[in-house]
Amino acid sequence: IPLRLVGSEMCIRDRCKKGDILSKHDHVIFVLDEGMELRYNDVRKFGRMKLVDHDDYKNQLPLSKLGPEPFEIDYLELYQKLKKKNKAIKTVLLDQSIMTGIGNIYANEICYQMHLNPYTKANVLSKNRVKELVDVACEILNKAILQGGTTIHSFSANGIDGLFQVQLKVHMQKHCPLGHEIKKVMINERGTYYCPICQKAKR
């Protein structure tokens, strides 16, 4: 089940009884044991669902095209991949075939913490910088996981808001922690927040 932008799964403790009112965005309900059910809720209907054999699911799209997560990727492997990418690092961070699990919010935060301009070409990063990228990605994702994620707009897991949004340094912020004005630009059609002072472009 690729959840896409705002899809979510909610595990409901009590099974729906006759006459109960469902959310209008509950599209699929899985009836589980012990009076439990799992509801698939998707406000904008971006998500997808496909029934596959358990032994073959990793060979199905889009899973078969996903790269490793930051927690498991070897930085030298990532370095070799980035050497072939003459694209902005912000765009490459969102390419799930290279490294999976980094969305737009976290890509912005990773670039800021590294003092890395989002327009920087991925293929100019040194091995040390790529190692730093992996370390920073893991650090930020771990913090977000511990805080229950980042609740922006309509998404919350299990009906509970995450708390990492209060720790965001640049994404949807007006000023960075040092007080500099944040600039918002579009890179490959994705909203990109960065600090032109802290993340100066290399010349």
Task: Report each predicted region and the residues it spans.
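A short, charged helix-loop
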Residues: F46-K87
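A residue-level signal for conserved active-site and pocket-lining positions in enzyme catalytic cores
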Residues: I12, F30, N41, G103, ...
